[in-house]
Amino acid sequence: MKNGHTNGNGKSSKKKYTFIDLFAGIGGFHIAFHNVGAECVFASEWDEQARKTYQKNFEKISPEMFASKNFAGDITKIDKNAIPDFDILTGGFPCQPFSQAGFKKGFDDTRGTLFYDIAEIIRIKKPKAFFLENVRHLYAHDNGKTFETIKKVLTEELGYSLYHNIVKASDHGLPQNRPRLFMIGFRNTKIPFKFPEKKPLAFTMSDVFDGAKVNRDVGFTLRVGGKGSKITDRRNWDSYLVNEKVVRITSKEGKKMQGFPDDFNFPVSESQAMKQLGNSVAIYAIQDYAQKIVEALDNNYE
């Protein structure tokens, strides 16, 4: 499965790396890492509608994963020791507050949150690298305590390096800003990691609307809920002037804005498809960073 509008990535690696796809949603991370030559050996997603879309699109790409029943549901109920060995952990996890005790205790502060499950998997499975994605507000969440706790757990307690950056989808070819916090780390802390260079837009909102005249080159960030605001309303994110008429985007356009390939299918309702796209990741940005992770492992393989 390749991107609908290619961004020029997808170089082959010296080694076939394996990865797991946590909080998988509809598989944005799966597409990005598949495109750089990695193989998904385990995925976890609790939402039944998202699971339908994920299975529909990846059953042929990762048949062994589905055949071995390694497409799990609720991450909190997974036997983490039973997860297959893998090289890279990936996941876009929800932003949640930690214990009011602050971040003095580190790992224990994260109990009861979904980050705790990520940290537990890293502790038990000891992957070569991880790639985590979250909303940019995580960095300043709870006066910075949330991020400091995450940093302490990943570096001081689990022993990984940590590189982090606020990344816009529009800096990696896609026509929406969608700023997100990317966190990358390596078990071998001596591995240097260089952020990928920014790229010009691969296409604009005009291309998204099949060449029509559109009032913006870069679109609004896709969201979940809150649809239907007037085009002049600052809360509007789903309406555009297309050939001088107000048009609301559908999953057809949303799919392009997130970098999903043209043959990606939604076996769910249109409202569910839009919700799933709003919850997904910007594939071009993920793929650019995935490529750099693979290159770093290739050049510094343990």
Go through the PLM ranges and name each one:
Residues 73, 165-167, 269:
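Conserved beta-strand termini and adjacent loop/short-helix elements that scaffold enzyme active sites
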Residues 205-302:
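C-terminal target-recognition/interaction regions appended to catalytic cores
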Residues 78-88, 95-239, 243-247:
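Class I S-adenosyl-L-methionine
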Residues 38, 159-160, 262:
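Short aromatic/hydrophobic-glycine micro-motifs
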Residues 41, 162-163, 282:
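A local structural micro-motif
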Residues 2-126, 136-140, 145-148, 155:
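Core alpha/beta nucleotide-donor-binding catalytic domains of modification enzymes
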